Amino acid sequence: MTKITVIGAGSWGTALAMVLADNGHDVRIWGNRPELMDEINTKHENKRYLPGITLPSTIVAYSSLEEALVDVSTVLLVVPTKAYREVLQDMKKVISGPMTWIHASKGIEPGTSKRISEMIEEEIPEHLIRDVVVLSGPSHAEEVALRQATTVTSAAKRMEAAEEVQDLFMNHYFRVYTNPDIIGVELGGALKNIIALAAGITDGLGLGDNAKAALMTRGLTEIARLGRKMGGNPLTFAGLTGMGDLIVTCTSVHSRNWRAGNMLGKGHSLEEVLDSMGMVVEGVRTTKAAYELAEKMEVEMPITAALYDVLFNGKNVKDAVGSLMGRVRKHEVEAIPDLSR
């Protein structure tokens, strides 16, 4: 049994806390809303983020970060990308020994273009880090909370660390594979949110299945193109954290990025969309970060660029589609590097 604290009591953090509790671990969950923490402790429900789901009574919720981290050597971070640095800075004030840092968030920091594992390594002193591990894959919180079959990937630089996290989470409904490609796993999980927004726009405009299939396929090409340039393994993007996550996020009504895009496609403004969602839409911030990163790395990402214009330059969604369809002719298949070298 492992004592583990989940940082972030949204839908995904709560669902993962359930998986860990089902596996017999000593699970704590921290959130910054005392009333929500009280509800988890007394009613065993997170009505705001997972209404109707009964949580294991063994999950203990804290609104005090210091209390939540007492005698804990493993943490699971599940907070919005924009909150990471602030949360990490608060955490390092109250921990004293090395920890395994698992994160299950999907995003890139605008301005710095940093992946989340890089933010952890920048903010937390080296002597307080045992390992940094990423948990990612096609996984809607609503389905995990219902204990429906789900498969994800655990990625770390040190394979033993990825396997330790694999063992923490594996059970009859939650299967975990391992992958040493932490760069590819993080980028796949983050960048697919951009394509999910675009897929929602496609559906909102009523463009049909042909257009959506093309968008998803060419979107995966963009993800892999940037991922390769950043040092990711091309094969990772054909796996759970690339193609798998892209499929589930672009095709499900559970996806908040798809829902946001769908509203944009139906004519709502970005401000209206974000006000109505009630939860973070990571794809909006990730679009900005990925656009900046693609410019910096000189990587062609036309779908990302078109979505950036829609979100931040006020371009009409129909005009954005027209500009993509009217691009100069291209070859479909790009050269794949020899991975045996």
From Swiss-Prot:
Main location: cytoplasm
Family annotation (InterPro entries): 6-PGluconate_DH-like_C_sf, 6PGD_dom2, G3P_DH_NAD-dep, G3P_DH_NAD-dep_C, G3P_DH_NAD-dep_N, NAD(P)-bd_dom_sf
Any one GO molecular-function label of the UniProt entry: NAD binding
Gene Ontology terms: biological process: carbohydrate metabolic process; glycerol-3-phosphate biosynthetic process; glycerol-3-phosphate catabolic process; glycerophospholipid metabolic process; phospholipid biosynthetic process
UniProt keyword annotations, A-Z: Cytoplasm, Lipid biosynthesis, Lipid metabolism, NAD, NADP, Nucleotide-binding, Oxidoreductase, Phospholipid biosynthesis, Phospholipid metabolism
The keyword Repressor appears for this protein: no
Catalysed transformations (reactions): sn-glycerol 3-phosphate + NAD(+) = dihydroxyacetone phosphate + NADH + H(+); sn-glycerol 3-phosphate + NADP(+) = dihydroxyacetone phosphate + NADPH + H(+)
Chain sites annotated for binding NADPH: 11-12, 33, 106, 141, 256, 280, 282
EC number(s) reported in the record: 1.1.1.94
Enzyme kind, highest EC tier: oxidoreductase
Binding residues for sn-glycerol 3-phosphate: 106, 137, 139, 192, 245, 255-257
Gene3D superfamilies: N-(1-d-carboxylethyl)-l-norvaline Dehydrogenase, domain 2, NAD(P)-binding Rossmann-like Domain
Segments traversing the membrane: none
Active site location: 192 (proton acceptor)
Pathway involvement of the protein, from the record: Membrane lipid metabolism; glycerophospholipid metabolism
Function: Catalyzes the reduction of the glycolytic intermediate dihydroxyacetone phosphate (DHAP) to sn-glycerol 3-phosphate (G3P), the key precursor for phospholipid synthesis.
NCBIfam families: PRK00094.1-2 (NF000940), PRK00094.1-3 (NF000941), PRK00094.1-4 (NF000942)
PANTHER family per the UniProt record, alphabetical: GLYCEROL-3-PHOSPHATE DEHYDROGENASE, GLYCEROL-3-PHOSPHATE DEHYDROGENASE [NAD(+)] 2, CHLOROPLASTIC
Family listed: Belongs to the NAD-dependent glycerol-3-phosphate dehydrogenase family.
Protein name, entry field: Glycerol-3-phosphate dehydrogenase [NAD(P)+]
